[in-house]
Every structure is written in C-alpha cells, then in structure tokens.
C-alpha cells in the first residue's frame, strides 16, 4: 500500500498558526507493510532513516494510542525538502500515522491527526497542527482549537505557485525573532484580514484572497531573515499575481492569481538577483492525502 501526502502552506497570509492549505506539489510518498520490527528506507531529500524519522514517530504514537504493539516496514520517497516552509516534517508525520491507521483499521480522524502531531513534536519540539491538518484534508483549514481538536474547512481549488529558494531558515530562528507582544493596531488589522480572507475563500473571490494575503503578526519580523522578500513580492505583483506571501516560516514563498507559471518565472528571476537558485512548483491548492 502507498500513501501520498502533499506539501502545505501554513499561515496562508494572516492566519498565524491557525490557517493552512494543501497544495499539489511537492509531496512525499510512503509505502509500507506490517512487520515484526521497525524499519524505514529513505530516497530523496536527506532525513533520518531510523526511528527518529517523523513517519516512524507518528506511526508508533498511533499504535500506542490504540493500545497495539505493531511495527511497520516503510519506504519513504522524500519529495518535500526539510526546513522549506512547505510542511516537510508534517507530511512525513501524517504519512506514518495514516499508514498505521490503515494497518490497525483506525478511522478516528482526531486520533490520526494527534499521532501525526507527535511526529511534529519530535521534529520541532511543538505538537503543532497547522501543517498536518491541511495535509490531511487538502482544504483550506482553520485550527479552531487543540483541546478538544476542532477544525473548520473550506473546499478550495485554485492555481498557486510556490517558490522555494536554496536557503534555510531554521524554525527556531523564525520563532525567536517574533516579539512577545504586538501593537493593538496590528492585532486589529490581522483580525480584519483573517476574517475577510475566510469570506473571500467561501465566495471564491480569488482577487480578494490575494489582496488579503498580508500579515502584521509574524511577517514584519521574519522579513529580517529574508532580505530578498520585498523584491520577490514586487516581481510577483508586477507579473500579475493577485497576492504573495511567505509559506509557513519560510523560506518558501507563494503567489495566487494570474498566470502562475509566468509569475513563478518572475519570482525566480528576482531570486537570481541575489544569487539564489530556486525550485518552482506550479500547482493547485486543495490537494489532500491520497491512497494509491
């Protein structure tokens, strides 16, 4: 059996640690079978090929939650680069949790997602869900609460281009630059942006969605780690993008609206001005985990 779990765009503009959406590319693929001992083989991007792998961590977590003693032999094709801002650890975590769920016959979505979040805890120190949740559903997702786990979803299907520069921004560093408090006016603005963005998505108004891809909570501070951000955004908008923002904590960025292939080329050229190579993914939003 094989499962494909796609990349995700966490935050999606103003939804810091709350919004997310699944996209078609890049993706991880995991094949697996029940075994007497744990084993994982990895092809593609460099991640641990042992029990530290988030796919193994999440699979073991689900088995423990279900009160079962089961091991898996897994083969992971790691297509999402680690530390990309595209939900790499979340994709592998969800793949592992789904694999164990299939073996055990577990259908409880909350249990599966909680197990996947344990993989995220192993990777980042925090059992966050803003990547594994949209990776599971594919929809635009809103993490309403963790205790209890509540998720709101809006089905989406629109073109998006994600551009991944050949640089790394450690999540710990991206968190460190955030202030403990933000000005009230910025909080008010983000509430307006986030609530309007949800309505625009429900109305399928992509131009409004693009206009609302702004953020006053994290982006102003994280831009210090991304000296190329403003030039890349300018290139995207001049090429016809409706909106542009950073994916997760970066370094990946994304744009919606217009000719996303041409927008991707324009953004790539902006990065070239900084001597930075990129991978460009012209894809679709609204892609969740798939069995095949």
Curated annotation (Swiss-Prot):
Q: Which GO terms describe its biological process?
A: threonine biosynthetic process
> Superkingdom, according to UniProt?
Archaea
Disulfide-bond pairs as recorded: none
Annotated coiled-coil positions are none
| A Pfam family annotated for this UniProt entry | GHMP_kinases_C
Where does this one sit in the cell? Cytoplasm
Report the InterPro entries cross-referenced here: GHMP_kinase_C_dom (IPR013750), GHMP_kinase_C_sf (IPR036554), GHMP_kinase_N_dom (IPR006204), Homoserine_kinase (IPR000870), Ribosomal_Su5_D2-typ_SF (IPR020568), Ribsml_uS5_D2-typ_fold_subgr (IPR014721)
- GO terms under cellular component: cytoplasm
User: Which keywords annotate this record?
Assistant: Amino-acid biosynthesis, ATP-binding, Cytoplasm, Kinase, Nucleotide-binding, Threonine biosynthesis, Transferase
- Where is ATP annotated to bind? 81-91
Query: What reaction does this catalyse?
Result: L-homoserine + ATP = O-phospho-L-homoserine + ADP + H(+)
Give its E.C. classification number: 2.7.1.39
Q: What is its main location?
A: cytoplasm
Annotated Gene Ontology MF terms? ATP binding; homoserine kinase activity
Pathway linked to the protein: Amino-acid biosynthesis; L-threonine biosynthesis; L-threonine from L-aspartate: step 4/5
Family indicated by similarity:
Belongs to the GHMP kinase family. Homoserine kinase subfamily.
Please explain the role this protein plays, according to its UniProt record: Catalyzes the ATP-dependent phosphorylation of L-homoserine to L-homoserine phosphate.
PANTHER family to which the protein is assigned, alphabetical: HOMOSERINE KINASE, HOMOSERINE/4-DIPHOSPHOCYTIDYL-2-C-METHYL-D-ERYTHRITOL KINASE
Please state what the protein is called. Homoserine kinase
Q: Which organism is it from?
A: Thermococcus gammatolerans (strain DSM 15229 / JCM 11827 / EJ3)
Q: Which gene name does the record give? A: thrB
């Amino acid at each position: 059996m094989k499962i494909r779990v796609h990349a995700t765009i966490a935050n999606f503009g103003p939804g810091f640690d709350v919004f997310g959406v699944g996209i078609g590319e890049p993706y991880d693929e995991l094949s697996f079978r029940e075994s007497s001992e744990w084993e994982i083989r990895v092809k593609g991007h460099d991640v641990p090929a042992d029990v530290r792998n988030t796919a193994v961590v999440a699979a073991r977590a689900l088995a423990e939650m279900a009160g079962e003693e089961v091991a898996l032999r897994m083969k992971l094709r790691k297509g999402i680069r680690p530390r990309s801002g595209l939900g790499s650890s979340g994709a592998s975590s969800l793949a592992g949790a789904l694999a164990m769920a299939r073996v055990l016959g577990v259908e409880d979505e909350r249990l599966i997602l909680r197990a996947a979040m344990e993989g995220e805890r192993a990777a980042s120190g925090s059992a966050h869900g803003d990547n594994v949740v949209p990776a599971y559903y594919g929809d635009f997702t809103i993490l309403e609460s963790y205790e209890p786990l509540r998720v709101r979803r809006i089905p989406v299907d629109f073109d998006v281009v994600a551009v991944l520069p050949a640089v790394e921004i450690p999540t710990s560093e991206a968190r460190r630059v955030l202030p403990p408090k933000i000005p009230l006016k910025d909080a008010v603005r983000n509430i307006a942006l986030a609530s309007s963005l949800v309505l625009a998505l429900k109305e399928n108004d992509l131009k409004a969605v693009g206009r609302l891809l702004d953020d006053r909570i994290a982006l102003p501070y994280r831009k210090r780690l991304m000296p190329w951000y403003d030039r890349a955004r300018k290139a995207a908008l001049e090429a016809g993008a409706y909106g542009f923002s950073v994916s997760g904590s970066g370094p990946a960025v994304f744009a919606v609206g217009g000719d996303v292939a041409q927008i991707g080329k324009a953004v790539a050229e902006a990065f070239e001005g900084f001597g930075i190579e990129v991978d460009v993914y012209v894809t679709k939003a609204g892609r969740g985990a798939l069995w095949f």
